[in-house]
Amino acid sequence: MASKSSISPLLLATVLVSVFAAATATGPYCYAGMGLPINPLEGCREYVAQQTCGISISGSAVSTEPGNTPRDRCCKELYDASQHCRCEAVRYFIGRRSDPNSSVLKDLPGCPREPQRDFAKVLVTSGHCNVMTVHNAPYCLGLDI
């Protein structure tokens, strides 16, 4: 029969291993400039404007060359972000409702920012870029901030 004194160190070791495992599983930081580019998903602006308002913001014809379409460029940026940081990249891209200047998205003639924000929230989903996120699925929670 095990004594109390031999169980306590074993329990302590188990707890410490669990805490260490949880700490290492939290992944990288996801801040603009630290874990994310300074302007996350800047390349998605064209795709979002095209899909929400049918306009081009680049001032030139939109490429239809495979691998170089606005969607392709946007999805590549999302794919290049670490899985752990993709939702945070979308959060930075759409900005906060309380601070309109925090968004990469801009009000454009005939294309207000709100429809762009609504569309950008689904960029990670299977109907668009289909990239896995921190949730191990192609979706992000809590983007209505």
Swiss-Prot record:
Disulfide bonds: none annotated. It holds the Pfam family Tryp_alpha_amyl. GO terms for cellular component: extracellular region. Its main location: secreted. InterPro entries: Allergen/soft/tryp_amyl_inhib, Allergen/tryp_amyl_inhib_CS, Bifun_inhib/LTP/seed_sf, Bifunc_inhib/LTP/seed_store. CDD domains: AAI_SS. Residues 1-25 form the signal peptide. It is found in: Secreted. Keywords: Alpha-amylase inhibitor, Protease inhibitor, Secreted, Serine protease inhibitor, Signal. The keyword Secreted applies. Endosperm. Belongs to the protease inhibitor I6 (cereal trypsin/alpha-amylase inhibitor) family. Subunit of the tetrameric inhibitor. Alpha-amylase/trypsin inhibitor. It could be involved in insect defense mechanisms. This is Alpha-amylase/trypsin inhibitor CM1. It comes from Triticum aestivum.
